[in-house]
């Protein structure tokens, strides 16, 4: 079974001002003359991390990571203004142009898969290969499954902590109730809601719960960006024209080679979405990890993803 490549450090770290408000952090790792790949983190709001550098052979790939608007080391932190899917799609192209890349492989999981699909379907985009994991198409049933009722029945212990952040009278629409708190003028209210929202996802991302991963989701800086930006996108339907926009536009990526990796027991993003995407995009290879959950760092998911990037190298 393949594992992550060894730890590496960036050969360049920088910032890119993408408009009058937002400045993005980016870094480059691996071989400056290698095959370019852009890594799209999850959330939205999750930010990139050091382990994301390790899915590609650093001798063969020029690995570009960046923190999306409001995330990680990008500024302003946890900001919701001018922060939509289409702003992020445009930012990917701005970064590509800034770095002098003609075209690149696009690698993304969870929300990163959503953004990768939106980007690849844009006629002006320059993604020529897709490596996707934990497919999330941002349809209403996906959101309701995870944030209203569904996953709650598999993780009732973790769900109770999430649910307790909202009074019973407001629980008929939990995403909206969290939205009111995450956009509150009161800092303590925002932070309490952010931690409850963030920890819920952290507690459900692995087949076997990773307590360190859950603890990381309690970090105030991480949780505020993660919860505020996720919730902002979700209550706005991803800023899509129609709910199934990514499937509607799948014909635009019909000739792009790709690999879809999805854990059989992914509770955060159920396998149905990967199945639906594969039917709409049959050129892609669908690899179901039989004993894995959502996280990219589940051993089977790592194995499949590293094999995919090696295959495209």
UniProtKB/Swiss-Prot annotation:
Q: Which reaction does it catalyse?
A: Release of N-terminal proline from a peptide
Q: Name one GO biological process term.
A: proteolysis
Q: Which domain of life is it from?
A: Bacteria
Q: Report disulfide bridges, numbered on this chain.
A: none
Annotated compartments: Cytoplasm
**Could you tell me the EC number(s) of this protein?**
3.4.11.5
Task: Give the annotated active site.
Answer: 110, 266, 294
Q: Establish whether keyword Glycosyltransferase is in the entry.
A: no
Q: Identify one Gene Ontology CC term for this UniProt entry.
A: cytoplasm
The record's listing under PANTHER family reads:
PROLINE IMINOPEPTIDASE
Q: What does this protein do?
A: May be involved in proline metabolism and sensitivity to ascamycin. Has ascamycin dealanylating activity.
- Family assignment from sequence similarity: Belongs to the peptidase S33 family.
Q: What's the protein called, per UniProt? A: Proline iminopeptidase
What species is given as this protein's source? Xanthomonas citri
Q: What lineage is on file?
A: Bacteria, Pseudomonadati, Pseudomonadota, Gammaproteobacteria, Lysobacterales
């Amino acid at each position: 079974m393949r594992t992550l490549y060894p730890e590496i450090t960036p050969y360049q770290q920088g910032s890119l001002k993408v408009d009058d408000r937002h400045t993005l952090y980016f870094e480059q790792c691996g071989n400056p003359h290698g095959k370019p790949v852009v890594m799209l983190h999850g959330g939205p709001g999750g930010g990139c991390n050091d382990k994301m550098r390790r899915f590609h052979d650093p001798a063969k790939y020029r690995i570009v990571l960046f923190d999306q608007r409001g995330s990680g080391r990008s500024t302003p932190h946890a900001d919701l203004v001018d922060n939509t899917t289409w702003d992020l799609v445009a930012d990917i192209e701005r970064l590509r142009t800034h770095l002098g890349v003609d075209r690149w492989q696009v690698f993304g999981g969870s929300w990163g898969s959503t953004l990768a699909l939106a980007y690849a379907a844009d006629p002006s985009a320059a993604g020529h290969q897709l490596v996707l994991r934990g497919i999330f198409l941002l349809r209403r049933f996906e959101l309701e499954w995870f944030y209203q009722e569904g996953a709650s029945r598999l993780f009732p212990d973790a769900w109770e902590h999430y649910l307790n952040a909202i009074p019973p009278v407001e629980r008929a629409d939990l995403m909206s109730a969290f939205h009111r708190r995450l956009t509150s003028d009161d800092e303590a209210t925002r932070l309490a809601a952010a931690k409850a929202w963030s920890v819920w996802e952290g507690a459900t991302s692995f087949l076997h719960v990773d307590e360190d991963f859950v603890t990381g989701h309690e970090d105030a800086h991480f949780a505020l960006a993660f919860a505020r930006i996720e919730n902002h996108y979700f209550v706005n339907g991803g800023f899509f024209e129609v709910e199934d926009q990514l499937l509607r536009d799948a014909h635009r990526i019909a000739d792009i080679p790709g690999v879809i990796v999805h854990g059989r027991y992914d509770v955060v993003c159920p396998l149905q979405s990967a199945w639906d995407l594969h039917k709409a995009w049959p050129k892609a290879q669908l690899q179901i990890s039989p004993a894995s959950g959502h996280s990219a760092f589940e051993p089977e998911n790592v194995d499949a993803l590293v094999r995919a990037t090696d295959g495209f190298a």
